Design a protein with these regions (language model features):
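Bacterial N-terminal signal peptides
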Residues: 1-10
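Predominantly soluble domains enriched in secretory-pathway, periplasmic, or organellar proteins
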Residues: 11-324
Length: 324
């Protein structure tokens, strides 16, 4: 029995061990740093279009899409090897991006040009895999996006007009738009689609809205730290991390109690976050330090920093916790 238990533990440990590369987007270098997930060393850099900011996995999980804002293009790479698969052009000013859960729609925020584009996802079309279906003119600087689990609603923050917008995905028209706190950035929708968390980069808290009704309602402001910015689920259905770029910290929020339960140091202007499958290791792009910071949640400290390119932004790995 002892031998069997040891084998089971060994198998579990092996399953939890990351095997796929970590990708960090270097926004000012037009490249992607490929990081070894075990040694945490940079293996190589992949060239992209100008200003790659965010990245997202295709519904079939065969491609990781990198949005190149200033090149009006998308770079598709293999999430397991980092090999470039293809480039899609004529995608106007893609800053942030999301796929709908029903795998029908691909949405981008045109940060510089003040609109949100909705594309029909056609993966079997080798010429036009994405066909523009609608364009919603936003206020000033649409920033981050989230889509509900039913694929009916897009939520978008307007960074420079301090607004939050909901868009009907089927009609491609706004449902509502409200004024919120200063410099809203990332938006995180809870798994039940009821609450929307908004990071306020111009303040030091996260605003929480009940979006389950026709009219959204502000129900709480969660004090996190100056420059509340980007979210990432821990993968346990209860906790979400938020980066506080000015405070140089990461806060862990309990989405049931809507309170901060832990805070971690994160030097260098923490921006985007990913969580390894163990649920205990954070990967954080340190925007101002040209580093990828590795944070051990149990130790509550940065245990490693990896040098990357200029202005590191999006960070992602196939071995992240929310896939469990």
């Amino acid at each position: 029995m002892a031998v069997l238990a040891a084998l089971v533990c060994s198998s579990v440990a092996a399953a939890d061990k990351p095997v796929n590369p970590i990708f960090v987007l270097n926004s000012l270098d037009a490249s992607i740093s490929v990081i070894d997930p075990v040694s945490f060393t940079e293996l190589r850099r992949i060239p992209t279009g100008k200003e790659p900011h965010h990245l997202y996995l295709t519904p079939d999980e065969k491609s990781l899409i990198v949005a190149n804002a200033l090149s009006d293009s998308l770079t598709l790479i293999d999430p397991k090897t980092g090999e470039v698969q293809r480039t899609i052009t004529k995608i106007i000013d893609p800053y942030h991006l999301r796929f709908s859960p029903d795998m029908k729609w691909f949405v981008t925020a045109a940060n510089r040009l003040d609109h949100i584009d909705i594309y029909r996802w056609q993966p079997d079309d080798p010429i036009t895999p994405m066909k523009l279906a609608g364009r919603v003119h936003a206020a000033r600087t649409p920033s981050h996006l989230s889509i509900d689990s039913k694929s009916t609603t897009i939520y978008a923050s307007m960074q420079d007009s301090d607004e939050l917008m909901a868009i009907d995905l089927l009609t491609q028209k706004p449902r509502w738009k409200i004024s919120i706190g200063k410099l809203p950035a990332d938006v995180y929708l809870t798994p039940d689609d009821r609450l929307l968390l908004v990071g306020l980069t111009g303040d030091e808290y996260v605003e929480v809205y009940d979006v389950s009704q026709a009219v959204p309602k502000l129900i709480k402001r969660i004090q996190t730290g100056a420059g509340a910015h980007a979210f990432r689920s821990r993968g346990d259905g209860r906790h979400v991390f938020v980066s506080n770029r000015v405070a140089n910290t990461i806060s862990m929020i309990d989405i049931q109690t809507l309170s901060v339960v832990e805070t971690y140091p994160a030097p260098g202007g923490p921006d985007c976050i990913d969580v390894l499958a163990d649920g205990k290791t954070l990967l954080v792009s340190s925007r101002w330090a040209r580093k990828l910071s590795i944070i051990d949640i149990d130790k509550k400290q940065v245990v490693r920093q990896v040098g990357v390119g200029r202005s590191p932004h999006g960070v992602w790995t196939l071995d992240h916790a929310s896939r469990r």
